[in-house]
C-alpha cells in the first residue's frame, strides 16, 4: 500500500527506488534477527515507463534565451533545429556546400531520406526564417559546417558531435531556473515541437514531409532529373 501511493501518483521511478530502499532495510533486519522474512520480496518492482516532458514553445523560448550565455554556435543550432525540424545528427551534419538552388539539401542519417528545404521557409510564430539563420551561421562558423566551433584537436574538420547539442541543451535548461519533471525535455524534443508548429501553420502533410515521414505518393514531388532523389518541399 505504501508503494501504491507513489504508483498511483505516476511516480513509478520513485516507487522503484523506495522499494529498493525498503528491501535493503528489511534484509538488514533479518540479519539482525528482528524479522524472519522480507515483506518486500513478494511485491513486484513497478514498471518504469520513461515519458519525456513535452517541449512547449514558451519553454523553448526560455531555454533559447538562456542559450545566449553559451558558445555562439549552440543557440544557432537550436534555431536551425526548430526551423528545419531535423534530428541532432542531421543538424550537426549540415554544410554550406549542401546549399544550392536556394535550398538546403539534407540527407537524413537515420532514414536516408533526402529532402531539399527552401531557404525561404519560415516559422513566424518563432520568428525564424531558414535563410536568415543560415546567414547568421556564416558569421560564426569557421568551416563548411553550419554549426561549428572551429578546428579542434578532437574535431579536425570543425564539426560538432550530436551529443554536444544534448549537453549544451541541458546546460541552457538549467540556466532557466525552471523546475522540470523527472524527465525534462531534451534537444531532440525541438524536432517534435517543430512538427507541431508546422502542422498548425502549414498543415499536417507539409509537417510530415519536412520531418521525413513520407509516403510513396508524396515522394513523387521531386526537384528535377539531376536531383530527383531529393524530396521537394
Residue map of PLM features:
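Short, basic (Lys/Arg/His-rich) helix/loop patches that form interaction surfaces
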Residues: 68-70, 74, 84, 140-142, ...
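Catalytic-site neighborhood detector that most strongly recognizes the C-terminal catalytic loop/helix
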Residues: 54, 108-112, 204, 211-233
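C-terminal catalytic core of Y-nucleophile DNA break-rejoin enzymes
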Residues: 49, 111-135, 142-171
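Proline-centered turn/helix-capping motifs that create local helix->coil transitions or kinks
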Residues: 30-38, 135-140
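Basic, Lys/Arg- and aromatic-enriched nucleic-acid-binding interface segment
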Residues: 9-20, 31, 35, 41-88, ...
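N-terminal core-binding DNA-recognition domain of tyrosine site-specific recombinases/integrases
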Residues: 1-27, 32-34, 72, 158-164, ...
